A protein has these predicted regions:
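Transmembrane beta-barrel domains of Gram-negative outer membranes and organellar outer membranes
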Residues: 29-262
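Cleavable N-terminal export/targeting peptides
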Residues: 1-41
């Protein structure tokens, strides 16, 4: 009788250990199957299509506003975007841009219109945890409803972290704009560089973007000092100030972005 009880207890113990071992193995296999991903601080103003090294199933919803006070009018630009990763390392995004202008002149009316639709893709072709670096390429198709045209924007991204809290990122590529009525083609070369410091064990960061647009006539450079606050594991808000330092643009601006991880 005692032998039967001992055998039963042994079988029960073996079964328990087997279940725990199987669960641990399954969990380890699941973790092992996840592709490498390096966390990089993402710029607030010129944000990316999706996280670099995105993993399948990740989704995010953003709303933002760019507010500029000018001599003749107060201009506001609003954006709504949805981004997701259908497969590992590939991000897709759809963004709509709206513009509102409130005239400060008596004989000029205000306006409100849908400006652009942006459809983007981004693929991280190199992800290295060892070097804390990621390289990616992408493409954005822009449909301009105001000027009547479309723009083609291939781009390249390189990001690198130092000591886990210091982040640098470069986003660069041409934007070729084609206008239907005149059949004219214009090109702007974009170089956007960002540097950030992330607060340890939080989703907060502080940093700066240097946004440059280069044409045959000038180089427009705008600094965007910025801050991001992680309000929860899914919700964050980012704020930036636009400070033009070269080019024809002289007006200060402010920008905010609300980020929600779905």
């Amino acid at each position: 009788m005692e032998n039967n009880k001992l055998t039963f207890r042994s079988l029960r113990a073996c079964l328990f250990i087997g279940i725990i071992s199987f669960s641990a193995a399954a969990f380890a296999q699941e973790n092992k199957s996840l592709p490498d991903k390096v966390h990089h601080a993402e710029p607030i103003y010129n944000d990316l299509v999706r996280d670099l090294g995105a993993r399948k199933g990740e989704k995010e919803f953003n709303v933002g506003a760019d507010i500029k006070r000018m001599h003749s009018a107060d201009e506001s630009g609003y954006l709504v975007e949805y981004e997701f990763a259908p497969i590992d390392r590939l991000g897709l995004e759809a963004e709509t841009d709206f513009a509102y202008s409130k005239s400060r002149m008596a004989n000029v009316s205000s306006s409100n219109q849908l400006e652009r639709l942006r459809l983007s893709s981004q693929y991280s072709f190199y992800v290295s945890k060892k070097h804390a670096a990621t390289l990616a390429v992408g493409y954005t198709q822009i449909f301009d409803f105001v000027d009547g045209g479309t723009a083609f924007n291939p781009f390249f991204i390189a990001a690198k972290n130092w000591h886990s809290n210091w982040h640098a990122l470069v986003y660069t590529g041409p934007e070729l704009a084609y206008y239907y009525a005149s059949s004219r083609m214009d090109m702007i070369w974009q170089i956007n560089t960002s540097f950030h410091y992330t607060v340890p064990q939080t989703d907060h960061f502080i940093g700066i973007e240097v946004n440059q647009e280069i044409t045959s006539d000038e180089i427009q450079t705008t600094l965007h000092p910025q801050i991001k606050l992680g309000l929860s594991s899914k919700l964050a808000i980012g704020m930036a100030v636009g400070l033009p330092v070269s080019g024809h643009e002289k007006d200060l601006s402010s920008f905010w972005r609300l980020i929600y991880q779905l």
